[in-house]
Every structure is written in C-alpha cells, then in structure tokens.
Amino acid sequence: MKSIRNKLSLATCSLLTTGNAAAEAIENAWETDASYLYYSEVDRVTVNKLVGAAKGFVSAKDTASIKVVFDSMSGATPTGAVNSSSLSYTGASGGSGITPSGESGALSNFDDTRVGVALDWAHEHTRTLTVNYNGAFSVENDRRSFSVAATANKENSSRSLRWTLGIAGTYDQIFRVNGNNTPEPLTRVEDQRFLGEGERTTTDVIAGLTSVINRRTTAQLNLSFGIANGYMTDPYKVFSIVDVNGVEWDQYFEGRPDSRMRWSIAAKLNHMTFPGNNGMHLTYRYYSDDWDIKSHTLDYAHRFIFGNADYLEPRIRLYTQNKAEFYPN
C-alpha cells in the first residue's frame, strides 16, 4: 500500500565586517514552520498529518534544515479479493479475521502511524556550484525506511542556465504488524505460510536542466532513472480464484517481481503574464518501467493576482496509466 506525498521553504543571513578587522560574523536567522492536515473520505479513509520544519544558515556558505513528520491513517482499503461472505482475510493493520456474513471481503480495515525525520545540508562550493546532502528515516507500524541523497547544482556565469545531477539510495524493511513477517508469495491464505521481514534497496539518478528564457519565462527538463531490488510485494494484498460464475473458491497472497527498473521525463514551463503578473505553470511527465506500466501526466495551474497578498489559483490535472503486465484481466 503506497501513499501520499512533500514541500519546503527558505531563510536569510547577514555578513558583518568591522573596519580593519579580518573577522566575519554570521547573523544566524532561522525560520521555523508548522502545519496540520486533516483529510477524510466517508466510509474510506481518515488522515491526520502534523509537520514541523526549521531552516537556517550555519555559516556564510552553509545552510541546514530539519523536517519532522507525524501522521496517522485509518479506514478501509481493497484487499484484492472479490466480495465474499465467509473467507479469511488479512487486514492492512496486520490483523486477520473472518469477513462477517453480508460484508465485503474485498475491503479490510487498517490503522497506521508514521514518524519521519529528514535532514538537509547545502554547501556553496563556488558562486555557481552548490551541493545538497540529504538523509532521512521513517518508522511505521509495518515499515522502516532509510535514505541518503546528494544533488549538485551548477550554473553558468550569467546564471541563466542551471544543470542538476543527483543520486539517492533507499533501504526499506517491510513486515506485517502482527508477527513481523511477510507471507510467502502465491500461497493460500488459509495455509498461513510466512517468511521473515522483506528487504528492498532502491537507487535513483536524476539529471536536469533549467533555463531562464526571458525575464518572465523559465523552462525545466528532468530525466530520472531508478532500479529497485528485493521485496516488492504488498504483504496485505491477496487475489481470488473464482469459477466461471465469479464465485470465489480460494484466496492467495499476491506475488510481484523482485526487481523493477523505471525511467521518466518531465518538462515544466513557468510564465508570468504582462500586464497583471499572473502566473502560468504547465507540466508534463511521462513514466515507464519494465513491469510494462506507462503513464502520462499533464498539469496546469494559473495564478490570478488580486492586490499584494491575495490570489486565486485554479488547477487542472489529467492522468492516464495502463496496468502492469502481470495484472489479471
């Protein structure tokens, strides 16, 4: 079960020098921010999310930031099975039980809590070269995740072009809440055959180019490539074996491939209109992987400015995706 997703901000500093003195001092101004999100879908899911962040200069060429996230999700999620009146199922919270008569075995309840911390350090090596170093970890009821990343941004002398190159690595441990294990793929749910914790490693590389076309227009192009190896299966998902009439005979734990290679290309155009200084933001993204999944995303936002502090920003997003090669018809 995957879900949900990320955003940040900036700070200032002053360099003070005194007459003939060679020493320099940094006025270390830190910014702090906090936010709370509540989201609910009737008879489906409820989300509570609390975020705290701080960022500031630690030297004339270095900035540091920390972000802490606490969120909880509860509700119901599809199991992958067809509707049933009596077969066993495993819930997304890790608990197992029998679907009561008259209820749908295609849904199960879940209750998940996550705590995450992200650290960032940015160093200005030269006037036109900055490198960001990142580290993060998160702990959930059924997952532990650790990641590191480094991204270099190089500008030309006029700062009208910026090249970006980044690499990231992630290590995940996946398990079910009760038992700290994962079901053996493609085995009957009724047999309750389990293995140890699942492990997955992921490596991602991104290359990008940002260009200032004119004083009101910028364009951006990003290419990304990623490889994941290890446990790729959702330990709570099952599928049903049915007869020609659609009546369920049995349930099996799902089993996905143990590797995945993916790539994407994204293009973005930002333009400020004249007169009015309204903002136009157009983004297109194409994604493909070796599971035969392909997707197209088109996103457009238009910001209408009213006075100095007020604005209205309608947004439209179009998305299409096909199914994986192993997904049943």
Which residue ranges define each predicted feature?
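Outer-envelope beta-barrel architecture signal
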Residues: 26-32, 60-64, 115, 127-131, ...
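Hydrophobic, lipid-facing positions within transmembrane beta-strands of outer-membrane proteins
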Residues: 30, 48-52, 115-119, 146-150, ...
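Transmembrane beta-strands of outer-membrane beta-barrel pores
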Residues: 36-40, 70-74, 135-141, 154-156, ...
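Extracellular loop and loop/strand-boundary signature of outer-membrane beta-barrel proteins
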Residues: 37-40, 103-107, 134-139, 149-153, ...
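Solvent-exposed loop/turn segments connecting transmembrane beta-strands
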Residues: 39-47, 109-115, 137-147, 257-261, ...
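Outer-membrane beta-barrel translocator domains and adjoining extracellular loop/strand segments
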Residues: 45-49, 67, 77-83, 136, ...
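Outer-membrane beta-barrel translocator/channel fold
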Residues: 67-117, 162-218, 229, 313-329
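Outer membrane beta-barrel transmembrane domains
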Residues: 86-106, 226-228, 232-270, 286-299, ...
